[in-house]
C-alpha cells in the first residue's frame, strides 16, 4: 500500500499516483476531459484494474466486453510508457485522443498506436470501444444521444 502512496503515477504525468489517477480509480473523482480519462485508463491497465476499464467504457458496451480476456491480457503485459500525441475536442460531447502506449510481453517491447473516441454522457467521459459489436448506422447511438449512430458516434469512428 505504501508503494502506491509514494510511487509516480503509471500514466506518465510525473505526479504521485495518489494525487493523479488514484482518485479516478477509486471513483472519488471523474476525469474532466478525454485526455485525463485516457491517462487513467492506461494507468488502470498498468495496475491490472480491469474493473475501471469496464466502468469507463460506454455503459451500453460494458456487458459486451470480454472481461476475462482483458484480465488475462493485462496479467501478461507490462506497460512501460505512454505518449499522448493529440487531444482534439470534436464537439461538446465528443473528443479524440491519439496516443502511443508502449508495453512488453515475453520480453519484447511493442507499441500500440491508436486514435480513440470518447463521449461525454451525463457529465462523465467514456471510451467508445470499436472492437465490440456496434449498432448499425440507422440504429440509435450507443451513447444515448437519441441520434442515429451514423449521425453521432458512428460518424466519428
UniProtKB/Swiss-Prot annotation:
S-S pairs: none
InterPro entries: NTF2-like_dom_sf (IPR032710), SEC_C_motif (IPR004027), UPF0225 (IPR023006), YchJ-like_M (IPR048469)
Pfam families: SEC-C, YchJ_M-like
Family: Belongs to the UPF0225 family.
Name of this protein: UPF0225 protein PM1617
Source organism per UniProt: Pasteurella multocida (strain Pm70)
